[in-house]
Amino acid sequence: MMNTYQMYLGLTRPDNETITTEQFNAYTKEVLDTLFDGYTISDAVGNWKGEREQTKIVSVCTEYKNLVQKAANLYKEFFEQDAVAISTLPALELV
């Protein structure tokens, strides 16, 4: 079943260092571009354990939840994140 998944990717490492634009772009090229035909990235401000941080929301429409989970796990690994939130929504119709 096709769904729209949104991954919430925080841009602050546990040591309070910021993930740079270059580092995030490398992740998109190495991971997102290889797993998905297309996706949308939005900027947001999130809150994790009482701390606000810059966040990227990656929206992807796919029937392969396992690929979304893989992308989230790789982000956690690459950037030493505690968690990546994923929301699941009904898919938008592509016309």
Q: Locations of the language-model features?
A:
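Positively charged, small/polar-rich N-terminal and surface patches that mediate targeting and assembly
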Residues: 1-95
